[in-house]
Amino acid sequence: MEEVIKNAHTYDVEDVLKFLDVNKDNGLKNEELDDRRLKYGLNELEVEKKKSIFELILNQFDDLLVKILLLAAFISFVLTLLDMKHKKIEICDFIEPLVIVLILILNAAVGVWQECNAEKSLEALKELQPTKAKVLRDGKWEIIDSKYLYVGDIIELSVGNKTPADARIIKIYSTSLKVEQSMLTGESCSVDKYAEKMEDSYKNCEIQLKKNILFSSTAIVCGRCIAVVINIGMKTEIGHIQHAVIESNSEDTQTPLQIKIDLFGQQLSKIIFVICVTVWIINFKHFSDPIHGSFLYGCLYYFKISVALAVAAIPEGLPAVITTCLALGTRRMVKKNAIVRKLQSVETLGCTTVICSDKTGTLTTNQMTTTVFHLFRESDSLTEYQLCQKGDTYYFYESSNLTNDIYAGESSFFNKLKDEGNVEALTDDGEEGSIDEADPYSDYFSSDSKKMKNDLNNNNNNNNNSSRSGAKRNIPLKEMKSNENTIISRGSKILEDKINKYCYSEYDYNFYMCLVNCNEANIFCNDNSQIVKKFGDSTELALLHFVHNFDILPTFSKNNKMPAEYEKNTTPVQSSNKKDKSPRGINKFFSSKNDNSHITSTLNENDKNLKNANHSNYTTAQATTNGYEAIGENTFEHGTSFENCFHSKLGNKINTTSTHNNNNNNNNNSNSVPSECISSWRNECKQIKIIEFTRERKLMSVIVENKKKEIILYCKGAPENIIKNCKYYLTKNDIRPLNETLKNEIHNKIQNMGKRALRTLSFAYKKLSSKDLNIKNTDDYYKLEQDLIYLGGLGIIDPPRKYVGRAIRLCHMAGIRVFMITGDNINTARAIAKEINILNKNEGDDEKDNYTNNKNTQICCYNGREFEDFSLEKQKHILKNTPRIVFCRTEPKHKKQIVKVLKDLGETVAMTGDGVNDAPALKSADIGIAMGINGTEVAKEASDIVLADDNFNTIVEAIKEGRCIYNNMKAFIRYLISSNIGEVASIFITALLGIPDSLAPVQLLWVNLVTDGLPATALGFNPPEHDVMKCKPRHKNDNLINGLTLLRYIIIGTYVGIATVSIFVYWFLFYPDSDMHTLINFYQLSHYNQCKAWNNFRVNKVYDMSEDHCSYFSAGKIKASTLSLSVLVLIEMFNALNALSEYNSLFEIPPWRNMYLVLATIGSLLLHVLILYIPPLARIFGVVPLSAYDWFLVFLWSFPVIILDEIIKFYAKRKLKEEQRTKKIKID
């Protein structure tokens, strides 16, 4: 049973029905439904059990640093309660534990809120499932909730329906059945489905090859069929994806930053424990001092000192500062179209070593585009035109001057000119020295790019003769200089002389009539002619986009002279002799016959506008075929406009279903109308019959009546079939016989397109008589489609996004490998990969070499299923040692496995995708990146980052920002650690000397959370280094602080401790008695615990001293403590300035390079002043106001930290240069 269901595609339908015990004519019986429900369950996706709010809260405290702080707060609270026997307790005595607990509660609240809003991917998956299904039960068709669909149910599906479960096709009632399953498989085009069984050799094939299986949640775009359900719920392919997402949720998903912070917490806890125990043991001899009253209280007192030491050592503000820094980074990334859903992912981007990118919709536009076409412009010569791009403008040039790329970048013709010695230029989209005014990456590839851009702008300002084509400046030949930085505009006279531009001709009339009218797709525009809706098969839509975007409108039809033998049975097509009166007529956008300006279209401008429009790509591509029972049935009433019929038939279907790149938008598109350009072509004729596509003919034809009442047959289809049926061909002068030589020339052109992974189509037409309409069976259609006139052919592909090639080159410069993982076929994947620099132009062609990977293999293309069959060791070897890889025909499980192996190898993996099939891999990767416009909700919710512009280039900007954030994070962590080392050193020295503690725990909390917090946050605004994207990515296990850096900050921290203790001691021993306090000697200060045994010890009563003179060492020390705290704060401000750079002096990088830091240091000092001079605050923090002389002393003790750090930087920088010099010598 399991075997039959698993491999239902290799069994006859009758065998499948027999195993499922169901009759295809009656369906399941109602009495057996309960048994099937018990056996197979309901047709719904499981949802992972959600954590309770209590579990979420507990998870926020499952952190070592947090646990240490909780323990410190608890002990502090207990010790404060124990002090009740000695003194009156006030609320301010509990300030330390209260502040710690409050901070932890706030952090937990933020964490719970983020987690509650993050996990929605499973709910999004459930929303993909259709809610209703048409099912046959007890011989009757009925509509039921798809939840109650069971294995063995017979279902009916037609255009616009979503498949409610995995099903085996029983019978197709239309001539063809096409399914849009790109959201599941990643294929860029809709897929033909058949009912016939497949060979046994396909038992373990990938899901893309299962041509007789319909998968749950995929959409029917053409045809009608019945099928039997073979899998429901979690057993379906989309159920497997859900299971993978659940598994990914349960995996350890700690980011590198979280791992580092946890490791830091472990190391810190060990250090704190050692220091606390050491301090406690050092003071063991003082436990019985009279001041404590008893040994127990002495023990508790020094235990409290140890707790204070722990508070000083823990950077309480670190979590808040890290969160703030990441949040600020996300704001900057939003401006660059990267929306961050999980804060920690920002830092992880900085250490990305491998980007695994989906192809369709990520690296490419996810819009099939016509990139090359050919016509017989001359009598015996086939002319091919190829798409070229400059900036936002597209052109078609004669391809005899171009290379055989998918579509010609600028290298194709500029390098051609350069090779001929006519011009020195280099303006390819992916070549060194290239320059483009809008190019975001030119700074990385040319040191003179900024100067060149300025020169270009100046040239533009001085020239008012730019052509409509977007040319920037016409540069005469005599102005050319012999250097690689010469800028050549496309409007240059040199180009006009060298390149033949395509210009629409009236002789191409029938070619475009065939493109538009032999086509069941449609596009709808708003009032500005911007596409807002499109319906139909992606291939047919590419033909309409070609006509619409280049605004090709009907003008004349030519009186072509036909061969005599052809004229015997037909009447020549007559010219309408009418010029187009449309306000968007041909002369507005294209040149006349005397003007050789090239056709232009700002396709990308439309793309930009589509982001703001309600852009829904509905897949009711062939809605007009719904319900057709036979080939050639009258599609529309004779004499009725094709456009009106098409629009009215689609009226109640436009919201039926959508493709995987549907963009949910609430904008109202009720004013959208069919494209004026497309309508103008369809209004040229009235459609009589459609002869639908069949696998045997591989053709589709349409019979129309033009305005002259002539009956014309237009055909499109597979080039080999069209060419075989053609007897003539159309030129600009006449109609000529098509001989074998010309047929071979056409075949060669088509084969060249195929080598470039283009999907090819050819077009033909012929004149019919009224008797030809009396057709009754399929054989009549074969006869009708003979003796055709060849019009031309074209190639389409989903082209790469603008600048994606440069973005990938920049990744390579930054030491990041880019892998393509796609569900598409190997030829298309390889062609795109070469175009965008994932593969080199001349590599990866030999498929046999690709699959026999050895140690020397550097470039590889792999089929997903074959890669899965490799041993784990071989998979690791390939992924570790191969710099460029393309994976094709991959399934969701393959993508997840690739990501898992890469992570096991220690790589930091970023995964991009837009479809449902990408969700498991997005979840598993260190960074999941989804497309925001065309991405499914499933992909978005499974991701960490969403790209608002669907552009791979944005990923590079995000990585740059991630690296900058990490560098800044290192700066403020170093700053905070050195500060905490200073505090620890202060307490340790105090305990070692046996003097009163100079800093109270609440003062340390103030410094750690507030005073240090502002400068630390401001360090997150440090601008990026100029070479941040020219460095290799760091390893995710690299420590934030290495041994040398720690030694460096121990030196600084030791000075901080010495300075804070020294000014404290200075006040007792040497400070002028401006406040009337009594100077004492060092012995008295270091043995203050024995004060009660000194019979004649007398001091002046200052501040809040009691009658007990020994209180001089507790309440009387408030001024000394204030001086100590002020020195600590000012040193920290100087230390923040030192943290601007790890190696560069303040003379090289002045503080005003980061004005946020300057303002933050001033703000921190103002806050410190507030607690000194506002009495209520001064009482809480145990401080008093300082005089001008006091501040002078504070400055004298603080400023040397600048000098000390400058000395350390000098030696550290010199050592760094020596290391670099040594490495260079070794490399040389």
Curated annotation (Swiss-Prot):
It is a multi-pass membrane protein. Residues 82-92, 292-300, 995-1000, 1068-1118, 1173-1185 are extracellular. Keywords: ATP-binding, Calcium, Calcium transport, Ion transport, Magnesium, Membrane, Nucleotide-binding, Phosphoprotein, Translocase, Transmembrane, Transmembrane helix, Transport. Residues 589-604 have a biased composition (Polar residues). Residues 452-478, 562-613 are annotated as: Disordered. It is found in: Membrane. PROSITE patterns: ATPASE_E1_E2. The chain crosses the membrane at residues 64-81, 93-112, 271-291, 301-321, 975-994, 1001-1021, 1043-1067, 1119-1140, 1152-1172, 1186-1206. InterPro entries: ATPase_P-typ_cation-transptr_C, ATPase_P-typ_cation-transptr_N, ATPase_P-typ_cyto_dom_N, ATPase_P-typ_P_site, ATPase_P-typ_TM_dom_sf, ATPase_P-typ_transduc_dom_A_sf, HAD-like_sf, HAD_sf. It catalyses: Ca(2+)(in) + ATP + H2O = Ca(2+)(out) + ADP + phosphate + H(+). It holds the Pfam family E1-E2_ATPase. Belongs to the cation transport ATPase (P-type) (TC 3.A.3) family. This magnesium-dependent enzyme catalyzes the hydrolysis of ATP coupled with the transport of the calcium. This is Calcium-transporting ATPase. It comes from Plasmodium falciparum (isolate K1 / Thailand). The gene is ATP6.
